Amino acid sequence: MALIFFSALAVAFSGAMMPGPLLTYTIRQSLNAGPYSGFVIIAGHAVLELLLIVLIFMGFDIILQSDSAQSVIGIVGGLLLIYMGADMVINSLKNKVKIELDNKKSKPGNMLFSGFIISAANPYFLLWWAVIGLGFLIQAYKLFGSAGVLIFFTGHILADFIWYGSVSLIVGTTRKFIKVNLYRVIIAFLGGVLIFFGGTFFYNA
């Protein structure tokens, strides 16, 4: 079981540390809501992953691998990320962003939901689970049954919590040293990154 756990941990780290829309959103919320935002966001991400594991064992992976599903996810997800990114850029240009805590956007429920939705909007994330993740799950299930799957999921999601939590803690605790103008530039840049990912998803759909 230790091999399954550490394999899941290593594989998840390799994916979590790659730049993507979820990391971009985590940095943005850490600046806005504080050092613990990443943990809440990844909790939403974890709920989606747990749901995907259940659906995959029900045969849903076939649907996720289909061209039509990938196209729909890419188009809808791409448009969602473009909208979020554009909103960040526009608010930065209009000087509507501020470092102070935004209670509405910082509610745990909102960040939890966003972690779920942003992950679901990423067609590459869903395809990874439908292909690569499925292979690991099958091996874990063959060796140790449901316990093996649980061990794999635990190792996988622990890596996400460690990485995104660390990023959130670092960004959230240093935000007080960031000047307002620099903060607006950072938010605009992060918005541009989301637009880039959204455009990529949409184009590849």
Feature map (PLM): residue ranges:
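Flexible interhelical linker loops that connect adjacent transmembrane helices
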Residues: 93-110
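Selective transmembrane alpha-helices of multi-pass membrane proteins
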Residues: 66-97, 156-167, 175-205
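Juxtamembrane transmembrane-helix termini in multi-pass membrane transport proteins
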Residues: 2-71, 131-151
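Selected transmembrane alpha-helices and immediately adjacent juxtamembrane segments
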Residues: 108-132
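Alpha-helical transmembrane segments and their lipid-water interface positions
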Residues: 22, 48-60, 81-87, 91, ...
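Hydrophobic/aromatic residues within the transmembrane alpha-helices of Major Facilitator Superfamily
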Residues: 13, 17, 86, 120-123, ...
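Alpha-helical transmembrane segments and their membrane-interface junctions
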Residues: 124-140, 201-204
